[in-house]
Structure formats: structure tokens, C-alpha cells
Regions:
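Structured alpha/beta reader/binder surfaces that contact nucleic acids or chromatin modification marks
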Residues: 2-105
Length: 105
């Protein structure tokens, strides 16, 4: 397993990441290999435009059914919005991973 050095987000999340309002991302099993303490270059999914560096704080497994208002707050969304976004991106996936991070620059 190689440690990931990049991460992409839909461009609609850029402002929340840069303002510190979004402090986690929820990913599927294909993106569970981020390593706490490492720094990743972040770019937009749509066009690959780099916009910041994030330090990975933790990676924790979670089931879709365990998502709570706490997770939604860290994503700067309501719980209903969060569940809808997750279902759109990862339809039918139950096992997910919470990647917590902090903005480096």
C-alpha cells in the first residue's frame, strides 16, 4: 500500500475547506489509506486545480447508518444533506471512512 499524497473534492466544497468550516470528508474503501500525520495536495475533482494542502489527522471506519449530526456539522451540512450527498457519490455503500484533516495552507 502506498500512502496517498493527493485528495480531490468537488469544487463546491472549496470555500468551506479554505474557511475551516469543513474539517472531515467521508470516503469509501478505495480512499481509506490516508495516513495520519501526512500532508496531501488538494485539488478540484472537476478540473484538477490545486487549491490547498491538508494534514490528515485520522481515518476512522463508519457505517452509513451511524452518520450523525456531529458528522454533518463537520461537513458544514445538515444530516439530511450529508446523507443525500453520500448516497449520490457512493450509492448503496454502507461501509465508509471518516477522514479528519486540518488546513495547512
Amino acid at each position: 500500500m502506498t500512502t496517498p499524497t493527493t485528495m480531490t473534492f468537488f469544487d463546491r466544497f472549496e470555500a468551506d475547506i479554505l474557511s475551516g468550516k469543513k474539517t472531515i470528508t467521508i470516503r469509501d474503501e478505495s480512499e481509506k489509506n490516508y495516513v495520519p500525520g501526512t500532508t496531501v495536495q488538494v485539488s478540484t475533482f472537476e478540473d484538477g486545480r490545486e487549491f490547498c494542502l491538508l494534514e490528515i489527522i485520522s481515518v476512522s471506519p463508519i457505517l452509513f447508518s451511524e452518520l450523525s449530526c456531529f458528522h454533518a456539522e463537520q461537513e458544514n451540512m445538515t444530516l439530511a444533506e450529508l446523507k443525500s450527498v453520500i448516497q449520490d457519490i457512493y450509492p448503496g455503500i454502507q461501509q465508509l471512512y471518516v477522514v479528519s484533516y486540518k488546513l495547512v495552507r
